[in-house]
Structures are given as C-alpha cells and as structure tokens.
C-alpha cells in the first residue's frame, strides 16, 4: 500500500545486509512523498552487534534525513504487536513544513541541569522553536524522572512523547539511536517544529490488580523487596491470585503503578504513575522497572486494559 505521509513495516529476521537493503528500498517506494523527513527504528536485542551497520543501511536505502529510535524487547508495526520476537520495525514519515533536530543527552547533563536555561543552552534549541518532542531514553544509566522534570521546566508546555528502551533482562544494556550513532546510555530527543504539531492519544489504560504494597528495598530502578518480601514473589503471588480469565488477560500486560499522592486514604485507577515492568529474576527476586522509585513508596501492580482506555 502506497501512502503520502507515513508507512511502517516489520523486518522479522536476523541481520542480513543485502536483504535489509532491498527491504528498505521497497519500504521507501511505498511512500509517495518526495523525501523522508523522519525515520523511527526499533530493534530487538539480537541486533545489538549489528546496530550501527543496520542504521547505515536504513539511512541510505530508505533515504532518511533524520533517523532515531531505540532497542525494544517488543515491537509494534501498525496494528500488529510483536512480543518476544527478533527483528526490527521501521516507520518512515514525510512531514512537509516541519523543522527537525535531534540531540543526545547524558546523566551527567541531567545532574548539571540546575536552571531552566541549561537545556536550551546545551542543545541550542530555544523554548519557542519546537512544537513538541519525541524522546527515547535508556532506563539503566539515566534518571529519567529527573530528566523529564528539568526538561519540562526548560520547555514548559511542550508535549514529550516516546518511551524507555529495553533489552534482555537481567543484562542492564539497551541501545539508543540517532542517525548513525549507537548509544548505550542517556537518551535522544527530537525537536519537532515548523508547521507540524504533536497530539497524543491514549490507546489503552491500566487497571490496578491485587493489593497496594510498600517498597521496602530499592536500588535505582531495581526493586528488591516489596513488603519485606522478594519483589518477584509478590508479583507471582499477585498473578496467581487472579481469576483464570484475569490471568489470561494479564499475560504480557503487567505494569507497576507508583502512587502519586501518598496522603490519599484509598487508591484507585488514576492515582498511579504507571511504569513498565522491564523484567524479573525469580532467583534473586528482583524486578526491574522503567522508573526510579524510592524506598517507602506505595505501589500496586497494574494490568493493561483495553476497557480502561480513555
């Protein structure tokens, strides 16, 4: 199917330079626009050794002006969701009238961002220029919550869309991509300005499952203990306590919710900041999450729920 503004496809196999060249050329041919303004790529972890070469193949043969993305344990191509599979997904966009600029940032910069002028000064992008941002962040080597707070202060009122990279848990390794560069820490942000704006749509919501708990031992984004018990055991017990139909719905759809306001007497859907469950290790009992929770924080596991969509 040929379209004017966007096209997306899934490459299901391992790295194959000749095959990827032909595939990228065919995908580019499906986009009727005279140029590709932006490409977004998401690769499964088996592409780690070939990431730089893959980026070069895609940039050249799909004729992409600006390419960004990250590694991902799960992939989405159009209406297709691909879990626990190898390959990559590439989306091509024609954005007439858009101005685009990509920047890479690090944890060191997050720690240095003491005032709202730091990021415009560092990136060279003034707050009045973008209409919004796309961002992809490594969850293991950067405090994403500190970053987004300082970013929001610098670029107040501008939407930020994107997500956290993932890999093969428990290995704390992910990749972030910008044009031909591969980063294993920090994040990448794409400023989108000009005649193109960003609008968000929430496709699915989350429903709390089980009971609320207190985090009793946390190390960065690793949760060791919940209620003085191994975190993985609490997750397994929560899952096993669900009715069979709820267990079926929860497979591959579990998240963690961190309470926003600890002063509430009861917690319901909407009271949680929902973050990814990146992985878990039954031997050590550790859960890795896409956030930096704190010891003493209240949490509740969440199930992705199409009926809770808004």
Residue ranges and their predicted role:
Residues 1-52, 57-60, 65, 70-74, ...:
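Small-residue-enriched flexible segments
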């Amino acid at each position: 199917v040929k379209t004017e503004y966007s096209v997306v496809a899934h490459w299901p196999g391992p790295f194959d330079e000749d095959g990827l060249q032909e595939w990228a050329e065919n995908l580019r041919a499906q986009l009727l626009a005279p140029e590709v303004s932006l490409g977004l790529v998401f690769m499964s972890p088996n592409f780690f050794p070939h990431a730089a070469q893959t980026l070069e193949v895609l940039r050249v043969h799909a004729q992409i002006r600006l390419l960004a993305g990250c590694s991902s344990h799960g992939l989405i191509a159009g209406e297709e969701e691909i879990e626990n599979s190898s390959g990559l997904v590439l989306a091509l966009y024609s954005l007439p009238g858009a101005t685009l600029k990509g920047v890479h940032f690090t944890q060191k910069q997050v720690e240095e961002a003491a005032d709202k002028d730091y990021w415009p000064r560092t990136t060279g992008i003034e707050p009045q220029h973008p209409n919004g941002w796309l961002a992809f962040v490594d969850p293991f080597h950067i405090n994403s919550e500190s970053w987004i707070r300082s970013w929001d202060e610098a670029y107040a009122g501008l939407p930020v869309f994107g997500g956290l990279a993932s890999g093969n848990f428990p290995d704390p390794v992910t990749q972030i991509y910008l044009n031909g560069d591969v980063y294993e820490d920090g994040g990448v942000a794409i400023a989108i300005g000009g005649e193109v704006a960003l609008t968000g749509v929430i496709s699915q919501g989350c429903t709390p499952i089980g009971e609320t708990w207190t985090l009793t031992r946390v190390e960065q984004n690793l949760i060791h203990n919940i209620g003085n018990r191994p975190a993985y055991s609490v997750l397994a017990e929560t899952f096993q306590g669900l009715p069979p139909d709820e267990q079926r719905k929860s497979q591959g759809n579990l998240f963690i919710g961190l309470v926003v306001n600890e002063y509430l007497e009861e917690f319901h859907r909407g009271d949680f900041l929902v973050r990814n469950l990146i992985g878990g290790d039954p031997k050590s009992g550790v859960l890795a999450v896409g956030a930096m929770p704190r010891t003493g924080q209240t949490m509740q596991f969440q199930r992705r729920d199409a009926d809770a969509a808004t």
